[in-house]
Amino acid sequence: MWEVRYHPAAEDERKELPIKERTALANAVEKLQRLGPGLPYPHQSNVEGVKRGQRSSSLRELRPRAGRSPWRAFYRRFGDVFVIGAVGPEAQVDKRKFNRAVDEAIARLDEVEEVVS
């Protein structure tokens, strides 16, 4: 079983989701725990258009309901642990807030990487 952790700010964002979306995200996290990097598309994917440096290119998005949820959890792998850095809307739902969530995830996960390195 793979370990999945939330950055504290991402945990706060998760708590703000409607209950059905929190449940869908919990189910997606459970799949990530079971399958780790073997979790196939459409349950996860690379975040497209992220070109802010080598570390940020490894940013992934967890896609609840196989991508049918309007929410995403943005994460990165650190060894045997996945850390969710932010929770935000899907890009086609709200591009501005999606970009903000991606930027926040990158910044938070870069901080985590500095601590674990």
Ranges and model annotations:
Residues 1-70, 78-82, 89-117:
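Basic, Lys/Arg-enriched alpha-helical interface segments
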